[in-house]
Amino acid sequence: MLDLTYETPAPKVISGAKEDWELVIGMEVHAQVTSAAKLFSAASTQFGAEPNNNVSFVDAAMPGMLPTINEYCVEQAVRTGLGLKAEINLHSAFDRKNYFYPDLPQGYQISQLYHPIVGEGEVLVEMGNGTARLVRVERIHLEQDAGKSIHDMDPNMSFVDLNRTGVALMEIVSRPDIRGPEEAAAYLGKLRQILRYLGTCNGDMQSGAMRADVNVSICRPGQYEKYQATQDFSHLGTRCEIKNMNSMRFIQQAIEVEARRQIAIVEAGGTVDQETRLYDPDRNETRSMRSKEEAHDYRYFPDPDLLPLEIEQAWVDDIAANLPELPDAKKARFRNDFGLSDYDASVLTADLDSAGYFEAVAAGRDGKMAANWVINELFGRLKKEDHAITDSPVSPAQLGGIIDLIASDAISGKIAKDVFEICYTTGRDPAEIVETEGMKQVTDTGAIEAAVDEIIAANPDQVAKARENPKLAGWFVGQVMKATGGKANPKVVNQLIAKRLAE
């Protein structure tokens, strides 16, 4: 069962020169829709193609070319909305957002201001120690991406690459529910995790497939609660938007430095201007780009080339029926079915590949032992070599085989680590490694008993001390394991030593 009991974390408080201030943050996340074709043309969305290779006549805004909606992009937006527990609008429409920029051939962007395809939803952002922030999603709308202007290829000229022009984006707009830099990064991380589970966006921030505009404002303690009670934004400070953030670390740094900038202005008796700003990570500062535009500045109007988008509830229901298991549900199942701790379940469900690998290892085996081997041994080794789980040289069947050898007392946990190392570097089968390398555990009580008796007889002083202090029995265990090359069954060794010392 999905357990959603949690406590709301305290907001981030920054001490100014005169008083304390709280942060209020909202985010607009631009997520590139996973689709082979663009939103209104059949041009490819392949990343890294030669400049201006993936451009159709529609993308280039050639005269007489009309947009045609990509149904799959609509389906992906609906799927995303359902994954965020959002309301799906059966009626939506596209509008023109008018502005001029060299990499926007049409002279406008096709977006959805008045009638977005997805309404209100939510994202539960866990912050550890039983705390979580429920961040409300105001809306999700579909829109076109712009192209890319390139200014560093020539000192006297700029260039334009239209490959990205017309690529489908989902703009996921949150309410101002985020209360600190860490929460902002955690929200973006959780949103990315959900989209990856859904298969609607790959979440690759480096390539620009996911980027965020971060709205930051400050308020005095108690003012946010007044806003919550009245939904009156006048209780909050003037917000500034930090544009095009594509790094979790930079998002946190930008929020912190922007909040401190606003605090300094207000405490000096000034007023914060509503504007769009850019974060400079080298100087760790935000810089003004332009005054913040409102909707009327873009002269939005319904796009006359596109009919309103009408979808049927039965189609939405069919998409909902085929949604994959999402992170929170998978995490709860791992805790319940495999007896895992909250931490282990979180690590293993961080991405689909890790979760799938663990389930394959744990099938028919002890879940806690499987989690221990996957997290501590496999993930630890992969991290050291900067490899992803998909590049693991040890298959789930091989790691499961090592666990089976431990469970059957064929090898000890210590020897199992040696087997894992050989398996990792050579790809050999664990059972074959144990057999050919002579690593099988000694379970013959007679042979172990002889080794125990020999160690006991050779160390009378240690025997006397161990009888007075039972904790010293571990020394004998170590000596027996050493004498048997680590192959003796530790459980049998402990039992025999305890028996001999009690005599």
Curated annotation (Swiss-Prot):
| Catalyzed reactions per annotation | L-glutamyl-tRNA(Gln) + L-glutamine + ATP + H2O = L-glutaminyl-tRNA(Gln) + L-glutamate + ADP + phosphate + H(+); L-aspartyl-tRNA(Asn) + L-glutamine + ATP + H2O = L-asparaginyl-tRNA(Asn) + L-glutamate + ADP + phosphate + 2 H(+)
PROSITE patterns the record matches:
GATB (PS01234)
Cysteine disulfide links: none
Family per record: Belongs to the GatB/GatE family. GatB subfamily.
Q: What is its EC number?
A: 6.3.5.-
Taxonomic lineage of the native organism: Bacteria, Pseudomonadati, Pseudomonadota, Alphaproteobacteria, Rhodobacterales
- According to the lineage, what is the superkingdom? Bacteria
Molecular functions per Gene Ontology: asparaginyl-tRNA synthase (glutamine-hydrolyzing) activity; ATP binding; glutaminyl-tRNA synthase (glutamine-hydrolyzing) activity
Q: What class of enzyme is it?
A: ligase
Q: Which Pfam families match?
A: GatB_N, GatB_Yqey
What does it do? Allows the formation of correctly charged Asn-tRNA(Asn) or Gln-tRNA(Gln) through the transamidation of misacylated Asp-tRNA(Asn) or Glu-tRNA(Gln) in organisms which lack either or both of asparaginyl-tRNA or glutaminyl-tRNA synthetases. The reaction takes place in the presence of glutamine and ATP through an activated phospho-Asp-tRNA(Asn) or phospho-Glu-tRNA(Gln).
Q: What is this protein called?
A: Aspartyl/glutamyl-tRNA(Asn/Gln) amidotransferase subunit B
